[in-house]
């Protein structure tokens, strides 16, 4: 990718979506299908959330561990 094309992709979101260039390459080619199915980054499991949120006073179905869903925050 030339410098001109790179700058154009920074400034133009439509061109960016059409461009297949990415500095890291195509990471999905490097991962096996089994590895792709096991990716769960940036989250906690449901059981961990339920175990931690109930003692904090959150009796809802699913909530974050932080207290934004608790009645005391409303």
From Swiss-Prot:
One MF annotation (Gene Ontology) recorded for this entry: signaling receptor binding
Kindly indicate whether the keyword Secreted belongs to this entry: yes
Q: Establish whether keyword Secreted is in the entry.
A: yes
Tell me the keywords, alphabetical order. Antibiotic, Antimicrobial, Bacteriocin, Lantibiotic, Secreted, Thioether bond
Where are the residues linked by the Beta-methyllanthionine (Thr-Cys) cross-link? 45-49, 64-69, 66-73
Q: Which residues carry this modification: 2-oxobutanoic acid?
A: 43
Indicate where the modification (Z)-2,3-didehydrobutyrine is found in the sequence. Answer: 48
- Positions of crosslink type Lanthionine (Ser-Cys): 53-63
Q: Where in the cell is it found?
A: Secreted
| Maturation-removed propeptide residues | 1-42
Q: Which Pfam families match?
A: Lantibiotic_a
Q: Which residues carry this modification: 2,3-didehydroalanine (Ser)?
A: 47
A GO term from the CC aspect: extracellular space
> GO biological process annotations for this chain's record?
defense response to Gram-positive bacterium; killing of cells of another organism
Q: How is it modified after translation?
A: Maturation of lantibiotics involves the enzymatic conversion of Thr, and Ser into dehydrated AA and the formation of thioether bonds with cysteine. This is followed by membrane translocation and cleavage of the modified precursor.
Instruction: Identify the main location.
Output: secreted
Question: What InterPro entries does the database record attribute to this sequence?
Answer: Lantibiotic_alpha
Give the protein's function: Lanthionine-containing peptide antibiotic (lantibiotic) active on Gram-positive bacteria. The bactericidal activity of lantibiotics is based on depolarization of energized bacterial cytoplasmic membranes, initiated by the formation of aqueous transmembrane pores. When present individually, LchA1 exhibits activity towards B.subtilis L1 (IC(50)=9 uM), Rhodococcus sp. SS2 (IC(50)=9 uM), M.luteus B1314 (IC(50)=1.2 uM), B.megaterium VKM41 (IC(50)=1.8 uM), S.aureus 209p (IC(50)=3.1 uM), B.pumilus 2001, B.globigii I, B.amyloliquefaciens I, M.smegmatis 1171 and M.phlei 1291.
Name the NCBIfam families for this protein: plantaricin (NF000539)
For this entry, the protein name equals Lantibiotic lichenicidin VK21 A1
Q: What organism, scientifically named, is this protein from?
A: Bacillus licheniformis
The taxonomic lineage of its organism, from the top, reads:
Bacteria, Bacillati, Bacillota, Bacilli, Bacillales
């Amino acid at each position: 990718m030339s410098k001109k094309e790179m700058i154009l992709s920074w400034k133009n979101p439509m061109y960016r979506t059409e461009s297949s260039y990415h500095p890291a390459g195509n990471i999905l080619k490097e991962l096996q299908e089994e590895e792709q199915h096991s990716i769960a980054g940036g989250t906690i499991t449901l059981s961990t959330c339920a175990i931690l949120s109930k003692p904090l006073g959150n009796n809802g179905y699913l909530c974050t561990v932080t207290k934004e869903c608790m009645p005391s925050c409303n």
